[in-house]
């Protein structure tokens, strides 16, 4: 079993059950769940929840709440209703982390204090359900487009169940210096998502968005293997003890058999675990020496 790393259902094609089966067969013990996989289940949300629980995979997190912060009036009220519905699904899945991405809406304010106020409100909505909110800065976000800015508003919001969601794609796309990781509180990093990309640079927001949604690759498969390994090592030295999830949107992978894609993820997890972090991987029970 590969501990500490998981896959995201958005990476794979097919039914929810087949995705969960492929992830489990590849040796992972956790899964990042996409709301579309849950609400799109032919048997409805209840059967989707049952499938996740039957898989034995621990939910890493539930995604994704978009464009929540910085709105006003009827737009804000609408987003609060959406957030409540997503939090209820998150709780039904026994998932402890909801991922929220920074707003790209031109209707959203750029006032950081108002953004922090809205994020605090979101966190308070999650408290009765025992859910943490991981706030991630999209590299094409209108105001928050680097993890340093996301961390700033998380600190301003000052809610114990509101923390940072860190995505390596956005770090590399925005070219945020990795030294900034040292300013973070490891206990307030609620989720780390890892992926690589084939381009050295994505200078425009449009390029970042297109690449992020269609052509990410697994860690070690792209041109950022060295800085990605550096990022993981910096987080480890910082004291981060949470989960790593492979968030890999890739149109090509959607056309490949599930086991083949899951095996690519497995290779990445082993590379990070053994060659980067130098951890030993426990043998399956049947192969452990007895006596």
Which role does the model predict for each range below?
Residues 1-96, 127, 163, 194, ...:
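N-terminal pre-domain/capping segments
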Residues 9-16, 33-47, 67-77, 104-113, ...:
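Acidic-and-aromatic substrate-binding clefts and catalytic sites of carbohydrate-active enzymes
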Residues 17, 69, 73-164, 173, ...:
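Active-site acidic/histidine proton-transfer and metal-coordination neighborhood
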Residues 24, 91, 185, 236-237:
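Non-catalytic positions within long, well-ordered alpha-helices that form the structural scaffold/packing
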Residues 28, 95, 189, 240-241:
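A structural motif
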Residues 30-31, 62, 121-225, 276-279:
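Acidic/histidine-rich catalytic cores of soluble enzymes
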Residues 223-238:
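A short, acidic, amphipathic alpha-helical segment used as a generic capping/interface helix at domain edges
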Residues 243-248:
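Short acidic/histidine-rich active-site segments
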């Amino acid at each position: 079993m590969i501990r500490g790393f998981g896959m995201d259902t958005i990476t794979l094609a097919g039914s929810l059950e087949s995705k969960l089966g492929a992830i489990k067969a590849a040796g992972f013990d956790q899964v990042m769940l996409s709301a579309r996989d849950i609400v799109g289940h032919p048997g409805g949300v209840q059967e989707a929840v049952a499938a996740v629980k039957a898989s034995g995979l621990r939910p890493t997190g539930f995604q994704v709440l978009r464009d929540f912060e910085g709105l006003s009036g009827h737009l804000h009220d609408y987003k609060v209703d959406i957030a409540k519905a997503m939090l209820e699904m998150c709780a039904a899945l026994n998932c402890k982390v909801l991922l929220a991405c920074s707003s790209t809406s031109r209707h959203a304010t750029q006032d950081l204090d108002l953004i922090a106020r809205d994020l605090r409100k979101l966190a308070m909505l999650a408290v009765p359900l025992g859910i943490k909110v991981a706030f991630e800065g999209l590299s094409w976000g209108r105001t928050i487009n680097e993890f340093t800015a996301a961390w700033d508003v998380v600190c301003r919001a000052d809610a114990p169940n509101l923390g940072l969601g860190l995505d390596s794609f956005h770090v590399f796309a925005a070219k945020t210096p990795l030294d900034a990781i040292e300013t973070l509180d490891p206990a307030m990093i609620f989720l780390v998502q890892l992926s690589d990309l084939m381009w050295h640079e994505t200078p425009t927001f449009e390029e970042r968005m297109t690449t992020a949604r269609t052509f990410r690759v697994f860690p070690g498969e792209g041109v950022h293997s060295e800085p990605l390994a550096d990022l993981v090592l910096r987080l480890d030295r910082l004291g981060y003890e949470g989960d790593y999830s492979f968030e890999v949107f890739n149109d090509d992978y959607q056309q490949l058999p599930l086991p083949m894609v899951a095996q690519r993820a497995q290779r990445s997890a082993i590379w990070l675990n053994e060659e980067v972090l130098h951890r030993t991987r426990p043998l399956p029970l049947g192969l452990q020496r007895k006596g």
